């Protein structure tokens, strides 16, 4: 299920545009995640008070966490599938501390694709979207495998 060199190039090219505004993209991703999948908000103690889009928009903590999420994902994507060193500590905290189900990783993957498509429609066509979906699926599958190693069925 690996990606070709061309697919990785497509992923990393669009990711460069994401990195140009990590705060904006990260904030948009988390806002959309919590709006589309409100059950995910329960996993974030410090964000539970954010009930409305306006509250989410004004939250500096949410913005900061969005940067953290996309920074970590970017480090993993840049490894082009050879991401064991980056993935293991992330999987460990998500499995043992935060207890984030794999289903929620699917949700955020879908949201990431939507947000990138909205912000960069001219640069994120069908081929790039397919490559990104594949890269995020690889990430999720590897996270799920690591979860099992840590005794979390997710």
Curated annotation (Swiss-Prot):
Heme b binds at residue 94. GO terms for biological process: removal of superoxide radicals. Nitrite binds at residue 65. O2 binds at residue 65. Keywords: Cytoplasm, Heme, Iron, Metal-binding, Muscle protein, Oxidoreductase, Oxygen transport, Transport. Its EC number is 1.7.-.-, 1.11.1.-. Signal peptide: none annotated. InterPro entries: Globin, Globin-like_sf, Myoglobin. Monomeric. This is Myoglobin. It comes from Anas poecilorhyncha (Indian spot-billed duck). The lineage of its organism: Eukaryota, Metazoa, Chordata, Craniata, Vertebrata. The gene is MB.
